[in-house]
Amino acid sequence: METQRLRIAMQKSGRLSQDSQALFKSCGLKINLREQRLIAHVENMPIDILRVRDDDIPGLVMEGVVDLGIIGENVLEEAQLIRASQGLPAQVKTLKQLDFGGCRLSLAVPDDVAYTGPESLAGKRIATSYPGLLKRFFDEKGLNFKSVMLGGSVEVAPRAGLADAICDLVSTGATLEANGLKEVEVIYRSKAVLVQAPNPLNEAKQKLIDKLLPRIQGMQQARESKYIMLHAPKDKLDAITDLLPGAERPTIMQLAGDTNQVALHVVSSETLFWETMEQLKALGASSILVLPIEKMME
């Protein structure tokens, strides 16, 4: 008998783990993930959280072992390429790209090696943990190379004489620099995504997903938006609202005892920079407040 509890897989530890936990909390899920248990139960919703290795999440979702998974696009697409080549199920439904887990998969070569393009690495040994994505990139360029598969510490491969170049995830580039390497080309950009198993779920689970998605969307919109309050001269309202990026239908209220100014409240969907605030002030705006938004729902 199919369980009525929604099962969500997330990374047990690593760069996506804390962000996934924060996402669950912001969506109102009461859960204790401090203990080293592989399965945690949400207290206020029929949801179970499975804490697993990130490499295992795509297969668990594709096979229908779990209903949802939070995974990096790089790990997901690598798994899809490898599984498809092996004749295994490789389909998922991508429900939402999330606003965390950003990284890039890049080619890097030793500092003293000249790089003029992918053709510079034709026939060379390239160490990577992402052979599928790397092969696809070079296939699209019509170039051959020798793949050196490593499960970790890819950046030491050139210095150890195992490879001529590497293809690895890059965040700041500090690890590359520490190992005498330079980033020369980005072949894939990735963020975390929420994915669903390909087969239809029962009505109870689907209703729960339909309840969670607007919460996730609202949290992401809130993080990307600011609530702006200011006093503005009536004759400058059009110019002032034009300066507020993403603003829609501001709330305008008459100031007590002042017939020439109004109070303007608006949600702006983009960051308000100091330069914009200075322009607002130059137009006569005053008492400008920019506040974070905790939650939003359209």
From Swiss-Prot:
GO cellular component labels: cytoplasm
Pathway: Amino-acid biosynthesis; L-histidine biosynthesis; L-histidine from 5-phospho-alpha-D-ribose 1-diphosphate: step 1/9
Keywords: Amino-acid biosynthesis, ATP-binding, Cytoplasm, Glycosyltransferase, Histidine biosynthesis, Magnesium, Metal-binding, Nucleotide-binding, Transferase
A molecular function GO annotation: ATP binding
InterPro entries: ATP-PRT_HisG_long, ATP_PRibTrfase_cat, ATP_PRibTrfase_CS, ATP_PRibTrfase_HisG, HisG_C, N-reg_PII-like_a/b, N-reg_PII/ATP_PRibTrfase_C
Enzyme class, broadest EC rank: transferase
Activity regulation, per record: Feedback inhibited by histidine.
Location, primary (coarse class): cytoplasm
GO process terms (BP): L-histidine biosynthetic process
E.C. number(s) listed in UniProt: 2.4.2.17
Localization terms from the record: Cytoplasm
Alphabetical list of Gene3D superfamilies matching this protein: 3.30.70.120, Periplasmic binding protein-like II
Cofactor: Mg(2+)
Domain of life of the native organism: Bacteria
Catalysed reactions listed for this entry: 1-(5-phospho-beta-D-ribosyl)-ATP + diphosphate = 5-phospho-alpha-D-ribose 1-diphosphate + ATP
Cross-referenced Pfam families: HisG (PF01634), HisG_C (PF08029)
Family: Belongs to the ATP phosphoribosyltransferase family. Long subfamily.
HAMAP family: HisG_Long
Role description: Catalyzes the condensation of ATP and 5-phosphoribose 1-diphosphate to form N'-(5'-phosphoribosyl)-ATP (PR-ATP). Has a crucial role in the pathway because the rate of histidine biosynthesis seems to be controlled primarily by regulation of HisG enzymatic activity.
Protein name: ATP phosphoribosyltransferase
Originating organism: Aeromonas salmonicida (strain A449)
Taxonomy of the source species: Bacteria, Pseudomonadati, Pseudomonadota, Gammaproteobacteria, Aeromonadales
